[in-house]
């Protein structure tokens, strides 16, 4: 019943783009508080020759690594995911996720840690990577809160966010004026915390992410350098 209700809500909550998408690439330092050294992360969005977009994220540290890639297209201002792949190794159990979004058959087909996944598909449903682009665009549009329907494991979950305000983030690229956003979770269900900062003057590029897991372990990425639409990101200097 709950899944059917969430699916029906997609008809009323289609993520739409505030502006034309801009390709970007960014490098980050990555810190896991439980490990003594920093790692690195790369995030990029590029448009392919056939018009589809590819969003890629890679992070590595010592023996741990994560790769995440989504492909999607834009149709009348709406994001339509096509494929999603995630591969995580180290730091406990590995994880592999594959999802294919079949818009002709209106279904999502894939696997999550070896278990088959099959879900109904309609416009408005996003994967765990593409929703980040929708959030980035909604923040650019000035929204103070936003919700997305996301394929999460073998279910469709609602991801809620709210804007906390503006904040200056000190990065290796300089001081960046950013909009601070947090993931809203039911504290009776999860004490996990996620906060994101998006650059106001650089296409609302993600400049910082801080996450606290349910076991108290912390993870953070912080911008080192990047480009938006081919222009190097340059913050203010002290």
Where are these regions (language model features)?
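Positively charged n-region of N-terminal signal peptides that target proteins for export
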Residues: 1-4
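Sec-dependent N-terminal signal peptides
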Residues: 6-9
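N-terminal signal peptide c-region/cleavage motif recognized by signal peptidases
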Residues: 13-15
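Acidic, serine/threonine-rich low-complexity disordered tracts
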Residues: 19-103, 140-238
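Hydrophobic, well-structured mid-protein blocks that either form specific transmembrane helices
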Residues: 94-140
């Amino acid at each position: 019943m709950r899944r059917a209700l969430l699916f029906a809500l997609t008809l009323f909550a289609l993520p739409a783009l505030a502006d034309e998408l801009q390709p970007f690439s960014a490098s980050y330092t990555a810190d896991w508080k439980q490990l003594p050294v920093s790692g690195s992360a790369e995030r990029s969005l590029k448009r392919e020759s056939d018009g589809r977009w590819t969003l890629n994220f890679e992070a590595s540290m010592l023996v741990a690594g994560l790769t995440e890639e989504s492909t999607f297209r834009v149709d009348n201002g709406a994001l339509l995911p096509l494929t999603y792949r995630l591969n995580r190794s180290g730091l406990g159990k590995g994880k592999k996720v594959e999802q294919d979004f079949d818009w002709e058959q209106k279904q999502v087909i894939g696997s999550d840690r070896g278990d088959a996944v099959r879900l109904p598909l309609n416009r408005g449903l996003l994967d765990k990577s593409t929703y980040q682009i929708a959030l980035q665009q909604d923040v650019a549009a000035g929204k103070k809160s936003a919700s997305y329907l996301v394929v999460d494991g073998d279910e469709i979950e609602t991801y809620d966010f709210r804007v906390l305000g503006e904040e200056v983030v000190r990065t290796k690229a300089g001081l960046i004026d950013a909009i601070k956003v947090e993931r809203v979770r039911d504290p009776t269900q999860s004490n996990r915390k996620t906060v994101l900062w998006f650059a106001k003057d650089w296409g609302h590029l993600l400049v910082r992410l801080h996450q606290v897991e349910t076991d108290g372990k912390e993870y953070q990425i912080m911008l080192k350098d990047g480009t938006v639409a081919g222009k190097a990101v340059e913050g203010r200097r002290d």
